[in-house]
UniProtKB/Swiss-Prot annotation:
Topological domain ranges for the Lumenal compartment: 27-53
One Pfam family, short name: DUF1242
Protein source organism: Saccharomyces cerevisiae (strain ATCC 204508 / S288c) (Baker's yeast)
Name listed for the protein in its UniProt record: Protein Kish
CC per GO annotation: endoplasmic reticulum membrane; Golgi apparatus; Golgi membrane
């Protein structure tokens, strides 16, 4: 089933995007900063911002998602 129609899969994709964008922004900040004001690519910069500012909550959500994946 597509991740668009399954809420659990959609949440997992969003969490993975946030974690990946935060990692990329931490390693190569200029890569995402140059597209900060771009309409489409600016979304990746925003996801990195969410991952940096809400990192304890994002980490907890990733841990809970991993536990739920192991249980299913």
């Amino acid at each position: 089933m597509s991740a668009l129609f399954n809420f659990r899969s959609l949440l997992q994709v969003i969490l993975l995007l946030i974690c990946s964008c935060s990692y990329v922004h931490g390693q190569w900040p200029s890569l995402l900063d140059r597209y900060k004001n771009h309409e489409v690519l600016g979304a990746f910069w925003k996801m990195a911002r969410v991952g940096e500012r809400a990192s304890p909550y994002v980490s907890l959500a990733c841990i809970l998602m991993a536990i739920s994946q192991f249980n299913s």
